[in-house]
């Protein structure tokens, strides 16, 4: 993933002082304040990072002798820098403008204070540059738990989502789930063209937002649980005690997975509701229902 400098300019309302290479992309989510570089130290310098000059760096340059400043700025801007942002609406030294034009480097200016600008850009890039993938499935918010429903086409994922929406839960996306990893969590969202849309066989595509209200759709949700639908197989030994822990790896993060056998007569929406509440219970309780049963059996044995 990469972010163009022009997109950064638009999203942060930055003033363009020098136009640079339009093809250059931002590919790392770290920033650099070049105080050490302007002092002549270039070990471990990362020119691919966004360079931000704040009041401290600006004052340091201001106090330099003109010839020294020209020499330092010339060397600094000889590197293939992605872009340079001057914060606090400070006036750039003319050496910066001259060398930036010569080397085709973007020089931008922001009215924000330096620390806030760095914080906003870091969070912005962490989101935009997060690893992504797209999976086939349906993502719903059930009782506050983000549940990814998977399974082969035609098994009833969308119909189950529709029933959950009718019961007051919320849809994030149907059919295609865009997933990005952000700080160890998985965030699911919908492709732009299908936001709020649900495809139901026999009916067609329905606009969930229009039929069930704005509160029935969410833009994104952290994925906590996977419910995998499969056709009921009589010879399959399905988990009946909740002790068979399965996980699915998405972008290097394991997500708890439950396999739900589907056959006529089973109310799958109710099962998913129960799974969501049970998942929340497992996070809050140190004892499982199986442990409770075993404790009761031990108590009965002791009484006998």
UniProtKB/Swiss-Prot annotation:
Any GO BP annotation: regulation of carbohydrate metabolic process
Cofactor(s) required for function per UniProt: Mg(2+)
Record flagged with keyword Amino-acid biosynthesis: no
Signal peptide coordinates: none
Catalytic function, reaction form: [HPr protein]-L-serine + ATP = [HPr protein]-O-phospho-L-serine + ADP + H(+); [HPr protein]-O-phospho-L-serine + phosphate + H(+) = [HPr protein]-L-serine + diphosphate
InterPro entries (UniProt xref): HPr(Ser)_kin/Pase, Hpr_kin/Pase_C, Hpr_kin/Pase_Hpr_N, P-loop_NTPase, Ser_kin/Pase_Hpr-like_N_sf
Protein residues bound to ATP: 151-158
EC assignment: 2.7.11.-, 2.7.4.-
Binding positions (Mg(2+)): 158, 199
Enzyme type, top EC level: transferase
UniProt KW keywords: ATP-binding, Carbohydrate metabolism, Kinase, Magnesium, Metal-binding, Multifunctional enzyme, Nucleotide-binding, Serine/threonine-protein kinase, Transferase
Keyword Magnesium assigned: yes
GO molecular-function terms, A-Z: ATP binding; magnesium ion binding; phosphorelay sensor kinase activity; protein serine/threonine kinase activity; protein serine/threonine/tyrosine kinase activity
Sequence segments annotated as region (Important for the catalytic mechanism of dephosphorylation): 261-266
Function: Catalyzes the ATP- as well as the pyrophosphate-dependent phosphorylation of a specific serine residue in HPr, a phosphocarrier protein of the phosphoenolpyruvate-dependent sugar phosphotransferase system (PTS). HprK/P also catalyzes the pyrophosphate-producing, inorganic phosphate-dependent dephosphorylation (phosphorolysis) of seryl-phosphorylated HPr (P-Ser-HPr).
UniProt family annotation: Belongs to the HPrK/P family.
Domain notes: The Walker A ATP-binding motif also binds Pi and PPi.
Additional information: Both phosphorylation and phosphorolysis are carried out by the same active site and suggest a common mechanism for both reactions.
The protein's name in its UniProt record: HPr kinase/phosphorylase
Protein's organism: Clostridium botulinum (strain Eklund 17B / Type B)
Gene: hprK
């Amino acid at each position: 993933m990469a972010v163009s400098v022009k997109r950064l300019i638009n999203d942060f309302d930055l003033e363009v002082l020098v136009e640079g290479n339009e093809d250059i992309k931002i590919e790392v989510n770290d920033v650099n304040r070049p105080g050490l570089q302007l002092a002549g130290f270039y070990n471990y310098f990362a020119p691919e990072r966004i360079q931000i000059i704040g009041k401290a760096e600006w004052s340091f340059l201001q106090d330099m002798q003109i010839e020294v400043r020209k020499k330092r700025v010339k060397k600094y801007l000889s590197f293939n820098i992605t872009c340079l942002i001057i914060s606090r609406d400070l006036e750039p030294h003319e050496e910066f403008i001259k060398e930036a034009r010569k080397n085709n480097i973007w020089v931008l200016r922001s009215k924000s204070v330096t620390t806030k600008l760095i914080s906003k850009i870091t969070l912005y890039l962490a989101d935009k540059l997060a690893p992504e993938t797209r999976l086939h499935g349906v993502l719903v918010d059930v009782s506050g738990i983000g549940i990814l429903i998977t399974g082969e086409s035609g098994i009833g994922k969308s119909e189950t989502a529709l029933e959950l929406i009718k019961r007051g839960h919320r849809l994030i996306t149907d059919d295609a789930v865009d997933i990005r990893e952000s700080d160890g969590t998985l965030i699911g969202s919908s492709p732009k063209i299908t936001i709020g849309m649900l495809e139901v066989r026999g009916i067609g595509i329905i606009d969930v937002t229009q039929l069930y209200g704005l509160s029935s759709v969410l833009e994104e949700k952290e994925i906590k649980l996977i419910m995998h639908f499969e056709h009921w197989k009589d010879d399959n030994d399905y988990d009946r005690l909740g002790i068979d822990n399965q996980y699915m790896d998405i972008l290097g993060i394991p997500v708890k997975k439950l396999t739900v056998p589907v056959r006529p007569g089973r109310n799958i929406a109710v099962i998913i509701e129960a799974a969501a509440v049970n998942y929340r219970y497992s996070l809050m309780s140190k004892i499982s229902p199986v442990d409770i049963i075993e404790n009761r059996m031990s108590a009965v044995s002791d009484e006998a």
